[in-house]
Regions:
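Terminal transmembrane helical module of multi-pass membrane proteins
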Residues: 133-198
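Membrane-proximal helix-loop-helix units in multi-pass membrane proteins
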Residues: 83-151
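Helix-coil boundary and interhelical linker segments in multi-pass alpha-helical membrane proteins
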Residues: 12-20, 75-85, 128-139, 195-198
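Membrane-embedded alpha-helical transmembrane segments of multi-pass integral membrane proteins
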Residues: 29-32, 36-39, 67, 95-99, ...
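Short juxtamembrane and helix-loop transition motifs at transmembrane-helix boundaries
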Residues: 46-55, 71-84, 99-110, 164-168
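N-terminal topogenic module of multi-pass integral membrane proteins
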Residues: 1-70
């Protein structure tokens, strides 16, 4: 499978509309949500420390923004741009320059902005996987995707909000554990539904 075929598979651009399945997407996201939130619940002290350091962690910011750059280059290189296809090469040049400029001149809360960008990018494959699927339970995926979109926009434009949210959530261990259990529960429900109903 070449990169164009991979793009077509992820975003259901094949002539028969085949691609990334609802079941596979649900299983992967369910596992990620369940395991990550269970880790946060079982290791509250360590995970709270990680969460508090994250907003101003420059290393994480560069790593996540690098992932966003590669993802954006992939999209720009293989997406159907219609009548704007002549701008493709300029876009491919602008993206790395923007990456460098953001790292150099927007260091404040870089990790939060990068995470917000990643959330915006990640929402699209999830929405494509659930599009036109008959199961009502498919809505578990679009709900998650739209939460990512809304929160991602706030993280990019108002990154200090993540610091405030983390401060609130980590004020007590009980509050952190409750939030972790809620995330784990959503992941487990999504995983079970994906295995049984998708």
């Amino acid at each position: 499978m070449n990169l164009q075929e991979l793009y077509n598979w992820i975003f259901h651009q094949n002539p028969d509309f085949s691609g990334l399945s609802l079941k596979a997407t649900g299983i992967v996201l369910g596992l990620v949500l369940a395991l990550s939130h269970l880790f946060a619940w079982l290791n509250a002290e360590a995970s709270i420390a990680i969460a508090r350091r994250f907003p101003r962690n420059r290393t994480w910011g560069i790593v996540i923004l690098g992932i966003c750059l590669v993802w954006s280059l992939f999209l720009a290189a293989y997406m159907d741009m219609g009548e704007f296809f002549t701008f493709r090469r300029y876009l491919l040049m602008i993206l790395p320059v923007t990456f460098a400029l953001v790292i150099m001149y927007v260091p404040e809360f870089l990790a939060v902005r990068a995470l917000g960008t990643l959330m915006l990018l990640a929402a699209s494959p999830v929405l494509h996987a659930a599009f036109l699927q008959p199961q009502i339970s498919r809505l578990l995926l679009p709900i998650l995707a739209y939460v990512w979109i809304i929160v991602g926009m706030f993280f990019v434009g108002m990154p200090y909000l993540m610091r405030d949210w983390v401060t609130w959530a980590t004020k007590t261990a009980g509050r952190w554990k409750l939030a972790s259990l809620a995330g784990a529960a959503y992941g487990i429900v999504l995983l079970v539904v994906a295995l049984v109903n998708y």
